[in-house]
């Protein structure tokens, strides 16, 4: 198996080659969402544009009841998106590559770097064991887009995680990722710290009571009545 060198200068050159966010994802201050009549889902930190036959699952921390990530599914493919704090002017790309290569290697997995639609793309195959003790493999492709003090991560899984490029099973999820808008709050954050999302009112009514309570407290609203 080829040993991947995350510090190979070609990856830094690739990341600095162009503005990989020219066609999105966008910062909130870069767009005028009132200029069109598109229906969007506002998760506070992240604003999404839904698409036909989109399925959505929220990943919630059991202890804090904070929404950490969103899993968007289309057919046999899925895209997990999450937002993190980032420096105002320094790229995190090199550190991310280094950390992900190290972690994947420690897990006995295979990791490859390649040119993707947002600079360096990280492709991983990680061995896992199911309940019967059988070895299975988690295959994924990871995208990163960095904006003003934020970093957006997208992890492609399923059919989209096993293909290359942005056509075929990746096409719809690629367009979804490009259409994302990040609204970074003013709170000071250590680079790499997760920035939680808030659930839109139209979806919150369907959530469990404890999640509704936690979301109300996070937004400084009165506790939900029993």
Labelled PLM ranges:
Residues 69-94:
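A short acidic-to-branched-hydrophobic micro-motif
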Residues 1-69, 134, 159-226:
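N-terminal targeting sequences that direct proteins away from the cytosol to non-cytosolic compartments
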Residues 100-146:
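Signature of long, low-cysteine stretches enriched in small and polar/charged residues
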Residues 81-83, 151-162:
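Short, well-ordered beta-strand elements
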Residues 59, 81-83, 92, 100, ...:
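Long amphipathic alpha-helical segments with strong coiled-coil/leucine-zipper propensity
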Residues 71-73, 143-150:
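Short glycine/proline-enriched loop/turn "hinge" motifs that connect secondary-structure elements
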Residues 99-107, 176-183:
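Conserved short hydrophobic interaction patches
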Residues 75-78, 134-136, 150:
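Short acidic/polar mixed-charge low-complexity motifs
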């Amino acid at each position: 198996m080829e040993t991947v060198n995350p510090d190979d200068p070609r990856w830094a050159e690739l990341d600095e080659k162009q503005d990989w966010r020219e066609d999105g994802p966008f910062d909130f201050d870069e767009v005028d969402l009132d200029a069109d009549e598109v229906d969007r889902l506002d998760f506070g930190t992240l604003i999404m544009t839904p698409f036909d036959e989109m399925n959505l699952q929220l990943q919630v921390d059991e202890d804090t009841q904070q929404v950490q990530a969103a899993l968007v599914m289309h057919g046999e493919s899925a895209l997990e998106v999450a937002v993190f704090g980032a420096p105002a002017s320094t790229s995190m790309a090199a550190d991310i590559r280094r950390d992900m290569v190290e972690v994947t290697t420690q897990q006995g997995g295979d990791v490859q770097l390649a040119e993707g639609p947002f600079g360096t793309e990280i492709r991983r195959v990680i061995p896992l064991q199911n309940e019967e003790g059988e070895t299975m493999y988690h295959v994924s492709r990871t995208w990163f887009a960095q904006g003003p003090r934020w970093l957006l991560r997208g992890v492609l899984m399923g059919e989209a995680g096993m293909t290359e490029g942005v056509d075929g099973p990746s096409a719809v999820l690629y367009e979804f990722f490009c259409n994302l808008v990040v609204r970074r709050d003013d709170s000071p954050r250590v680079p790499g710290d997760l920035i939680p999302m808030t659930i839109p009112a139209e979806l919150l009514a369907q959530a469990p009571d404890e999640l509704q309570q936690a979301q109300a407290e996070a937004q400084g609203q009165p506790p939900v009545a029993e």
